[in-house]
């Protein structure tokens, strides 16, 4: 029986990926559809992806599939064909191609079965996730941005909004998607008569959010087809003004795609204009935060003098200290002035 999970160390896999000469293409996609046996589907799909040297992160659940992956360029069309024929529900599925891509986004394939492909926290048997808002294409998005009767809602987390967003878009301040949904309903009550336009990175969160808003009595709801990634690509192709400002945060080693030249965020240490996320080099911290080149040099890639001092300790002493505390993996929430427990590179399903 074939091995259906990775058995090689992360360090070895990363070194192997970095040594590759063939370029790779970063792709994301999702689909809400009924999967009768997620585990069986996962195992079959794992073999297909492994045979094509696909790396990345894939979640499957009874409600569908959510994937962010990296595919060798020479195998992209074969991948597309095999994905489309794997299940009739996936035939013709839109694939979001990365806007900026160094081919080093992933180095291992992780495929997991979960309760939901996006952790929404919804526990309402009457909720119909298929009753979604209408799609908006790039030209429609720009028209809506000029419509005084439209309100744009960013359904991403605070660290995503901080480095880039649509003009005048409302932030729903939260650390996870499940926290955002009830807050969005509460915050938008005063705009119930407006046109509600929801967006996210690639479309998966705003699609479900649009259904949730309709479930809660909002009638004029839209969401951007393919999210920020598809919008920016189509706007550029069609010669339209790109109305997204700043950088689009992405959930892989790149941590961001430049959409516009504006830098709207600031270094969390000195306040200089900067929108580059990084993780604290101290293995006992791994804080996700924004750091400018000057502070990176000053603090040796760490988030604080304390972490800088700890990083300089002998490795054995560092391990001893890490064992005595809850391992960090946190995100700095500048808007609330506190740290939040999270993965080093946040989970896109949260």
From Swiss-Prot:
**Enzyme Commission no:** 1.14.-.-
The reactions it catalyses are: uridine(34) in tRNA + AH2 + O2 = 5-hydroxyuridine(34) in tRNA + A + H2O
Q: Where is the active site?
A: 200
State one molecular function term (GO): oxidoreductase activity, acting on paired donors, with incorporation or reduction of molecular oxygen
Keywords recorded for this protein, A-Z = Oxidoreductase, tRNA processing
Function noted in UniProt: Catalyzes oxygen-dependent 5-hydroxyuridine (ho5U) modification at position 34 in tRNAs.
Give the protein name, as stated in the record: tRNA uridine(34) hydroxylase
Tell me the organism.
Salmonella paratyphi A (strain AKU_12601)
